[in-house]
């Protein structure tokens, strides 16, 4: 059983292209997702409504791993917080989230930098959430 904090960068909400994919701080490819086992866990922010559907649709695969969505956990664990996005969590956790306004014309390095920083933020957020869940349950 392995745990992977991941993120993707794609060309927008109605994605037609995935620019890059990162898990545990390293760039991954389609084979990474294909080879996941049911006992593996994928952790990400808004993965249930965005990343997983985009991966399954554009890569033509079915993700077999268990899923933990840190956005849903954020709503649950921090109900009085107004904004639950990764940018806001980056501010709270002191990790700057790179801003991207062009989702089609940047270099792979620029998309990868953003993706890796998102994984850093989300890893720190997941560790915080996990510690709170352990205290609660």
Predicted features along the sequence, with ranges:
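A general structural motif
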Residues: 1, 38-40
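Entry/capping segment at the start of metal-dependent catalytic domains
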Residues: 1-21
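Active-site-proximal helix-loop-helix substrate-binding element of RNase H-like nuclease domains
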Residues: 14-16, 23, 27, 40-134
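Short acidic low-complexity segments
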Residues: 29-36
């Amino acid at each position: 059983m392995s745990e992977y904090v991941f993120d993707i960068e794609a060309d927008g909400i109605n994605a037609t292209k995935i620019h890059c994919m990162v898990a545990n701080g390293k760039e991954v490819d389609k084979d990474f997702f294909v080879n996941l086992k049911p006992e593996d866990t994928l952790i990400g922010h808004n993965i249930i409504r965005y990343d997983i559907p985009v991966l399954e649709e554009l890569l033509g695969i079915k993700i077999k791993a268990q899923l933990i969505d840190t956005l849903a956990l954020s709503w649950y664990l921090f109900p009085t917080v107004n904004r639950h996005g990764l940018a806001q969590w980056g501010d709270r956790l002191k990790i700057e989230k790179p801003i991207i306004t062009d989702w089609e014309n940047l270099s792979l390095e620029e998309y990868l930098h953003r993706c890796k920083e998102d994984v850093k933020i989300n890893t720190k957020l997941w560790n915080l959430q996990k510690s709170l869940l352990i205290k609660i349950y």
